[in-house]
Regions:
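N-terminal assembly/interaction segments in proteins that build large macromolecular machines
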Residues: 2-264
């Protein structure tokens, strides 16, 4: 059997980040050839990542960052809470937000090899669950909110108005989880399904058509729209008004938002 020195093991570990015994076994299998041993570790890492792919990643970290006129938000998932606090995991998550902030969501493809290697070293699935980047145009502001202490829910908002109000909106979105900014964004077929459900409720039977239509619209507003549409939701900072009313009061408007949540 080829004699493997401690310095060879250290060099391979420095190259690959592999655990000591894995590095030593790879060197033995490769007959002491560092490059071949590194390739063996890489192949084993790919196999390990493929085996773990698809495992649920309900822990992890959401990170948001704003730099001048652009901002980014990413959600990097792990299987367990301890890994979400692991220095290697956190270092990888920082690389993801750096890449997305500078180059956009497609930049995460350049980190795939590193992700695979990390999966092999840590021993559980790690995935970039979501990545988005916004550019603020004339008169627009960006704001973000990541909910402490777990940092598993985060929001990035692009709006017209003050940064302070935009941040309050981001906090609202984190808690209320709307899917659309305004009613105009809701697909017509989705509204039609909701109307159909309401029309079949027993308490509407026998009502005149105009009364029935009014009741359906009222229930849509208080139910479906208040749940799904940001501007229709009760403002968490003052439930006596809707988000839309709060925005109008300040001459503000939400242009876009993204919300990521790691459920667990």
């Amino acid at each position: 059997m080829t004699e493997i020195s401690a310095s060879q093991v250290k060099e391979l570990r420095d190259m690959t980040g592999a655990p000591m015994m894995d590095a030593k076994r790879a060197l033995v299998e490769a007959g002491g050839d560092l490059e071949k041993a590194a390739q063996l570790l890489r192949e084993k890492g790919l196999a390990a990542a493929a085996k773990r792919a698809g495992r649920s990643v309900t822990e992890g970290r959401v990170i948001a960052r704003i730099e001048n006129t652009h901002g980014a938000i990413v959600a990097v998932g792990s299987e367990t809470e301890p890994v979400s606090k692991n220095d290697e995991f956190l270092g990888f998550a920082e690389k993801v937000i750096d890449a997305v902030e500078k180059q956009g969501p497609d930049a995460i493809d350049s980190l795939e090899d590193e992700r695979v290697d990390l999966v092999a070293r840590i021993g559980e699935n790690i995935e970039v669950v979501g990545a988005s980047r916004f550019e603020a145009h004339d008169g627009e502001v960006l704001a973000s909110y990541v909910h402490p202490p777990a940092q598993k829910i985060g929001v990035l908002v692009r709006a017209q108005g003050s940064p302070d109000l935009a941040r309050l909106v981001a906090m609202h979105i984190a808690f209320a989880n709307p899917r659309f900014v305004t009613r105009e964004e809701v697909p017509e077929d989705e509204i039609a399904v909701e109307r159909d459900i309401l029309e079949k409720l027993p308490d509407l039977e026998g009502k005149p058509d105009d009364v029935k239509a009014k009741m359906i619209e009222g229930r849509l507003a208080k139910g479906f729209f208040a749940d799904s549409v940001l501007t229709d939701q009760p403002w968490i900072h003052n439930p006596d008004q809707t988000v839309g009313q709060a925005l109008a009061e300040h001459g503000a408007e939400v242009r876009d938002f993204v919300r990521y949540a790691l459920a667990g």
